[in-house]
Design a protein with these regions (language model features):
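Glycan-recognition and catalytic cores of secretory/periplasmic carbohydrate-active enzymes
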Residues: 74-82, 101, 178-185, 252-255
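Aromatic-lined, polymer-binding surfaces characteristic
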Residues: 1-161, 165
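Terminal, non-catalytic domain-edge segments
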Residues: 152, 156, 170-174, 181, ...
Length: 257
């Protein structure tokens, strides 16, 4: 699979709004996220591994970390909030595997600042909320990932800044706005460059992201906001519930005790 340094040399996804354009970044991010889930599995099995097995797994994890994640440590993402918190959750998983509290602290501080920059005061998300006919889907996905990150950061002992928390509350309210009034939701204009905005109605996803199958749970836990009734979302999310975990954050929020 393509590594981080190689993917930076490739064209952006949906170049020129072409939905058929090759998306090299997806190949990289999917491989990165599979690797993150590999570490999560290794963490669960760590106490069951023999000394030789642990040595092999640890060597592989360190090798893959250098390829997919080490180059992104403290990297400033200019647009959007996507899978595994732009890789931040994967870095926290690695920090857990290596028991590197310093790395975890640096990552959380960096990611909170990034989230504060990418989440606007009114709750809209840079890039995510302005994806044309997929805006609702990507906004709710971005919020799901942000809430998942905040929940995990809390387990590390981090306190979410009040300003960021307020933005997440508003972002939750924007999820509900998109459900209740699509036109009002999309009336918010975006002043930046949007290379991945999709206008084709054939590609429309005018519903809450069904991949975020426990968004209602995370919203209630982290922000206290109740998710509005979205019939399409409730029907479609059943497919991803069978996956067992939310693949964008690496765990199942419905299993939170």
């Amino acid at each position: 699979s393509i590594g981080y340094y190689e993917v930076k040399k490739k064209p952006m996804c949906y170049a020129g709004g072409d939905i058929n354009a090759p998306c090299w970044y997806h190949q990289y991010s999917f491989a990165r996220d599979v690797f993150a889930n590999y570490i999560i599995t290794a963490l669960w099995l760590k106490d069951e591994l023999s000394e030789q097995e642990l040595k092999i797994v640890d060597k592989y994890i360190n090798k893959m970390y250098k390829k997919f994640l080490e180059p992104t440590e403290l990297h400033k993402e200019e647009q959007g909030f996507y899978q595994f918190a732009n890789g931040g959750l994967a870095i926290l998983v690695y920090a857990s595997w290596t028991n590197n509290k310093k790395l975890a602290a640096e990552e959380i501080n960096h990611r909170f600042k990034e989230m504060d920059r990418l989440f606007y005061e009114d709750g809209y998300i840079n890039n995510n909320s302005f994806r044309g006919v997929k805006a609702q889907w990507y906004h709710s996905m971005g919020l799901d990932i942000a809430l998942g990150y905040v929940y995990i950061a809390d387990l590390w002992g981090a306190e979410t800044p009040k300003k960021l928390h307020n933005k997440l509350v508003r972002a939750s309210e924007v999820v509900n706005l998109a459900i209740a009034d699509w036109d009002k939701f999309t009336s918010r204009k975006y002043s930046g460059t949007q290379h991945n905005k999709i206008s084709s109605k054939d590609s429309a996803r005018m519903h809450t992201s069904h991949m975020a199958f426990a968004l209602d749970t995370l919203m209630k836990i982290v922000t206290g906001v109740e998710l509005e009734h979205d019939a399409v979302y409730l029907q479609k999310r059943t497919y991803h519930m069978k996956d067992g975990i939310d693949e964008s954050i690496g765990f199942n929020p419905n299993c939170i005790d």
